[in-house]
């Protein structure tokens, strides 16, 4: 389009109206430049024509326009010498006008050059201002993120202190309840023994019945002591699990359940039949009791099948296929060997042997990084790195394909590292 305008030295007024001021200045500059080029070309040919008798070349236009020389009465080209004809200006005046025109054109070129310099300065000024504004926005964003993390840490510490306080209160209530039960039972045994002493003169049959009654009472006491000890152990175990999970709701629910179990035990204790006929309580049997930490590979496999398979850990989203980044129980060295020949950003997720969760192994430009993923609760999150919690393991991986794991490292999950051997290293988990 620009070449066509410069060729015709004409632009449609509607098109000109749509141009900005800067574009109009540029177009004007280009058209003047083209005029000067043609003028200089013509001057060169005129000089050659004077020296060698040549004529300027005809410019072929797209519209097939041409020039026809005016002929005089003698049939030759009609010639008019400027300044010598009737009514012409003197040569000196014409020369002055040409000099003035050249001076005007030179001043115009200098003005255009100054405008280009000014335009470059304006562009650089606004480009620098835009860069500074972007830097300021990034700095403010980083500051807000740091403040959010500090607030989250303070909240976590406050929740932890609340856990400890509630645990101590519940422990005191449990100990007080056991103490009251022991005192009440001691009174009952005292009166039982007292009555037995009063009837010591009874017959031999009554003596045997009394001994049998005493034996059963002691057995009932031992059974109640064992139940109390089991309740304390179960309370301690659930307290540790609640702290590991990091949820107030889980601990509160456990407190309510423990309180209900203590109340139920107290009600059963008050409604026990005669000590001569003790009835043992039937305690529920749990099929899977997870240890505090993994103790063997068999326990890890069972944990994965019991708790992680129902949550679709290791599967792609909304499919029955196992994710390419998922691996089984492999060591740190095996993970680094798999990532050795891959580029920065490659990663895999393997089942951890240290915690109830996983380890995300990440390939750096030089070396590797390993991040622990906690899966002991109802969510998945990095330990000590990222406070974000995710409903599934796939959600965590997809989230960090777009968001970095740490601000200092800038780790972004890019290329999953798949299986190299057959059968795959996770086959024991899905058998």
From Swiss-Prot:
Pfam families in UniProt: SH2
PROSITE patterns from the UniProt entry: SH2
Signal peptide start and end residues: none
Keyword Ribosomal protein: no
Keywords of this entry: SH2 domain
GO CC annotation, single: cytoplasm
Region (Disordered): 211-234
PANTHER family membership: SH2 DOMAIN-CONTAINING PROTEIN 4B, T CELL-SPECIFIC ADAPTER PROTEIN TSAD
Protein's name according to its UniProt entry: SH2 domain-containing protein 4B
Source organism (scientific name): Homo sapiens
Lineage of the species this protein comes from: Eukaryota, Metazoa, Chordata, Craniata, Vertebrata
